C-alpha cells in the first residue's frame, strides 16, 4: 500500500469526522467500487482496511447498483457492509441470490431506494407521463394496494423490512411529516407478489430516467 493512497483516504475520513463532530463512523462505503478493479484497487482497499484497523471506521464496503458489480468484486475483496437498491419492482439482488449469499457470509446488507425515488408512492394522477410505457404495471400495483387496503408507502416499507437477509433500510425524507408517517407505519411482515418484479433498467434505474 502506498503512503499517498492511505494519506488521501485517511484525510477524507478525518475531515468527515470533523464535520460530523464524531470520533468514528459506522460504515465507509466506496460509491464507485469498480475502481477496485483498476491499478489503484489493491492499494485503495488496503487503505480502507487500515483506517478500519486504527479505529476510524467500524465497517468498510461498497455501495453498488447491479449484481454484475458484485460478480466482479466478490472474488477479489470481501466487504463488511454492502448497500444495494431494493424495492417491490427491483428485486435483482434477491433473485440473483446475492442477498442470501451475503447473509450466509456475514456481510451486513443495507438497502436503499425502497420507494424508487418516490415513484412507487406517487398517486397515479401524479405519475409523470414518461412512465406510461409501464402503465400495465401501475394498474396492477394500484389495484393490489386497494385490495390489501394498504398505502404504497406502507407496502414498500414493510416489503423491505420483511426480508430476512436485509439488516438495515436506508430512507430519505423531505419533511418531518413524512418521517412521522414512516415511523408510525406497521412493521408487520408483508409479502408483495413476485409479478411486480421488473427487469427493465429504464424503469428501475433512476439514472436512465432522463433518457425517457
Indicate residue ranges for each PLM-predicted region.
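Short, solvent-exposed loop/turn segments at secondary-structure boundaries
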Residues: 1-6, 38-42
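Short, acidic/polar
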Residues: 4-20, 65-72, 156
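Generic alpha-helical secondary-structure signal
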Residues: 8, 12, 28, 158-159, ...
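Structural preference for long, well-ordered alpha-helical segments within the folded cores
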Residues: 15, 24, 47-51
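Active-site groove signature of glycoside hydrolases
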Residues: 17-36
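Beta/alpha (TIM)-barrel catalytic core signal, keyed to glycine-rich beta->alpha loops juxtaposed to Asp/Glu
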Residues: 32-204, 208-211
Amino acid at each position: 500500500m502506498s503512503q499517498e493512497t492511505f494519506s488521501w483516504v485517511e484525510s477524507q475520513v478525518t475531515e468527515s469526522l470533523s464535520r460530523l463532530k464524531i470520533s468514528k463512523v459506522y460504515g465507509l462505503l466506496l460509491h464507485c467500487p469498480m475502481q477496485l478493479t483498476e491499478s489503484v484497487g489493491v492499494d485503495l482497499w488496503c487503505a480502507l482496511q487500515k483506517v478500519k484497523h486504527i479505529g476510524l471506521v467500524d465497517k468498510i464496503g461498497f455501495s453498488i447498483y447491479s449484481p454484475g458489480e458484485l460478480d466482479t468484486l466478490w472474488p477479489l475483496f470481501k466487504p463488511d457492509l454492502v448497500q444495494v437498491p431494493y424495492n417491490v419492482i427491483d428485486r435483482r439482488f434477491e433473485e440473483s441470490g446475492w442477498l442470501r449469499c451475503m447473509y450466509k457470509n456475514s456481510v451486513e446488507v443495507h438497502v436503499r431506494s425502497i420507494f424508487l425515488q418516490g415513484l412507487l408512492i406517487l398517486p397515479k394522477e401524479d405519475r409523470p407521463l414518461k412512465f406510461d410505457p409501464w402503465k400495465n404495471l401501475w394498474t396492477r400495483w394500484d389495484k393490489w394496494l386497494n385490495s390489501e387496503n394498504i398505502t404504497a408507502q406502507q407496502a414498500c416499507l414493510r416489503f423491505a423490512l420483511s426480508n430476512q437477509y436485509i439488516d438495515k433500510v436506508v430512507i430519505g425524507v423531505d419533511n418531518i411529516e413524512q418521517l412521522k408517517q414512516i415511523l408510525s407505519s406497521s412493521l408487520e411482515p408483508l409479502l408483495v407478489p413476485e409479478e411486480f418484479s421488473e427487469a427493465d433498467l429504464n424503469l428501475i434505474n433512476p439514472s436512465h430516467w432522463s433518457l425517457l
